[in-house]
Amino acid sequence: MDFSTRAVADVGHLMRFRARRARNPATHRWVMAAMLGGTLLVAVAPAFVPGAGGGDQALSVLTLMPVAFAGFLAVAVVSAVVSGGGRELLPRDQAAPYPISPTTDHLGALLLAPVNTAWLLQAWLLLGSTAYGVGATWDLVTAQVVVLLWLLVATSIAQVVAWTMEAIRRSRHGIVLMRCLSATLLATAVWLHAQHQLIPVLDRVPTVWLVVGGIDGFSWRWALTVAVEVAIALCAVLVGVFPAHLAARRSARDELRVESETREARPNPRSDLFALVRTDRSSVWRTVPMRRGLLVLAIGPGLVAIAGDLPWHAMTILPGLVASGGALLFGVNAWCLDGRGGLWRESLPVAPQTVFTARTIVLAEFLLITEAIRRNSASTTARAVNTA
C-alpha cells in the first residue's frame, strides 16, 4: 500500500497509452493547446473588464469567493462519488490481466479530473471571478496561484471522500448505509435552511482564510497560505491511497448485480438504427454511475433552488440547467469518452450517420426523463414547503 515509484511510472505509461490511441495526434495537441489557452484567457481577461478590481460588483464577487471555493469542493466530491471513485485510466475489465495497483488508479483519477466538464467549468468560474474581483494588478498573479492550488486541494480531498464512500458502498450493507447517509445530509441541509442557519454556516467556511491570503498580495501571509494548500494537497493524495486499496479489495456489489442479471432475449430489431438505439439505451440504464448522475441532476437543482429561496419566475432556468447537465453527463461520454464502446462500434458494418442518429435519440430520451423527474420532484418539494 506504499506510495511507490512504480505506481507513478505506471501512470505515465497509461497516460502515454491513452494519448497514442488518438486518431489524429496533431488534432489532439491542438485541442490541448486550445484548452490551456482558454484557461489562461479566462484567468486574465476578466481583470480588464470595466469595473474589475474596484466598485461594488467586484467587492461582491470577492465576498462570495469563500462560498465559491466551498462550492467547487462540493461539486468535485459529488462528481467523484457518483462516478464510483473517479474516471479510470484503463477500464476495469481491460485492466484485469495487468498488475495495475489501486495506487495507480488513484493517481490516474486525480490526473483525469479535469476531463470532467463540470470540474472544468467550475474551475474557469473561480479563475474568472478572481480576475474580476482583484483586477489588473500584480496581486492577480498571487491570487490565481492560490486558486490553482485550491483546485488541486479540492480535487485531492474529493478523491479521498470518493474512495472512502466507494469502500463503504462495497461493504456488506454499504448500499443501505450510503442511502441513509445521503438522506441524513439532505435532512441536515433542509433543517439548517428552515432554522435560517444555512447562510451563517456558509459564512464560517474555512475557505475564508484562503481567500484572504490569496488577495493579500505577495507577503508572508500569502506564502503561508500557499504552504498550507500544498501540505493539504500532498496529505490528501497520500491518504487517498488507503481507501483506494480498501475499495479495490471489495467487490462492486451494485455494478456486479446489474451486470449479472439474467434478461430474456428480445426479437431481432428491424433495422440497424433500432439495434443501435437498443444497445445505447441499455448501456445507459444498466450503468450504475449513470443512474446516480441522473438522480443528482434531476433532484439536486430543485432542492438547491428551494433551499436558496429562488423566486418562481427564476425557476425557468432549471430545465436548461438540467438539460445541459444531462448532455454533459451522457452526451460527452457517448461521443467523446466512450472508449470501450467506440472500439467495437467502429468494426460494425453500419453507416456513421446511423450511429450518430441512434445516440441522438437516446440522448434526447435521457434528457426528457431527467427533466420529467426534475419537474415532479420540484413541484412536490414546493407543495411541501408551502404547506409547512
Predicted regions and their residues:
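Hydrophobic alpha-helical transmembrane segments of membrane proteins
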Residues: 1-92, 101-340, 352-388
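Catalytic phosphate/nucleotide-handling subdomain of diverse soluble enzymes
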Residues: 345-347
